Curated annotation (Swiss-Prot):
Compartment list: Secreted
This protein's domain notes: The toxin is composed of 2 domains: a highly rigid N-terminal inhibitor cystine knot (knottin) domain and a rather flexible C-terminal linear cationic cytotoxin domain that forms amphiphilic alpha-helices.
Signal peptide feature range: 1-22
Keywords: Calcium channel impairing toxin, Disulfide bond, Ion channel impairing toxin, Knottin, Secreted, Signal, Toxin
Listed InterPro entries: Spider_toxin_CSTX_knottin, Spider_toxin_CSTX_Knottin_CS
Function: Enhances the high-affinity desensitization of human P2RX3 purinoceptors.
Protein name (Swiss-Prot/TrEMBL): U4-lycotoxin-Ls1a
Primary location: secreted
UniProt lineage: Eukaryota, Metazoa, Ecdysozoa, Arthropoda, Chelicerata
Record GO cellular component, one term: extracellular region
Tissue specificity remark: Expressed by the venom gland.
Species of the source: Lycosa singoriensis
A Pfam family recorded for this sequence: Toxin_35
GO MF entry, a single one: toxin activity
Amino acid sequence: MKVLVLFSVLFLTLFSYSSTEAIDEFDSDAEEDMLSLMANEQVRAKACTPRLHDCSHDRHSCCRGELFKDVCYCFYPEGEDKTEVCSCQQPKSHKYIEKVVDKAKTVVG
């Protein structure tokens, strides 16, 4: 039993050493590739859609609130034809969580 434990510890030690050597070699090559990609990267931020504005053109374009991103809700208004209307809105749960966080910030300081 002691021999089995000794060999398993030895095996794990050798395995972890060999895997770290392979990872170190991979990391150095990956870092050079990543740096060259980052040098060529361009910022492509598009304008976000403010709260309560129409987001039917891009349903993932709603702006962020203090903590959470607003959600694009689509609905069919009553009395009109079957035209879908979408707007960026803050879910009630997110509103309550932001209020609790604001209260906690004022209490804690």
